[in-house]
Curated annotation (Swiss-Prot):
Organism: Wuchereria bancrofti
Residues covered by the TCTP domain: 1-181
InterPro entries cross-referenced by the UniProt entry: Mss4-like_sf, Mss4/transl-control_tumour, TCTP, Translation_control_tumour_CS, Translational_control_tumour_p
Entries under PANTHER family matching the protein: TRANSLATIONALLY CONTROLLED TUMOR PROTEIN-RELATED, TRANSLATIONALLY-CONTROLLED TUMOR PROTEIN
Predominant cellular place of this UniProt entry's protein: cytoplasm
Protein name: Translationally-controlled tumor protein homolog
GO molecular function: calcium ion binding
Any one GO cellular component localisation term in the record: cytoplasm
Amino acid sequence: MLIFKDAFTDDELASDSFPMKLVDGLIWEFKGRQVVRREGEIQLAGANPSTEGEDGDEGSEECVERGIDFVLNHRLQEMNCYEDLATFKSYCKSFMKKVVELMQKNGKSEAEISEFKRKIQAWVVSLLSKDRFKQLQFFIGERMAEGQGEGQVAVVEYRDEEEGEVPYLMLVKEALVEEKQ
């Protein structure tokens, strides 16, 4: 299994246990789903206790957690402060500067860095459109939530599909470290 970690905080943000695709060589998108499960239980794609008769709510003292599977599995923390347009823009500006510095440190060429800047700017502009931005949710990893560094903010967007609204986690590829487990 591949784990995708934040290059700056070492937080686990996602894994290849979710359907995923690389968009424009820039953004990893992970397809999730809403789940109900016993607290602390980690499930890989394909198993959903809420549809398998193990609801956990009926006369049980067990704690049940509900949410998006990739958020629960990787213990991501929702950060409402990024829902403010000015705050998110400011974050993007400082974060992209850090990513460019990381790319330089990792020996990326000026052409690769220029291409990244062009693509990331277009992606951020697309997120900032009013109708889209209002629908986004923002999450961070545990270490960043504890103040142990400034890393990547995971952006979650719900998209209408045949099976209903489906959550997608979006992460900047250049700010991730892939680790085999």
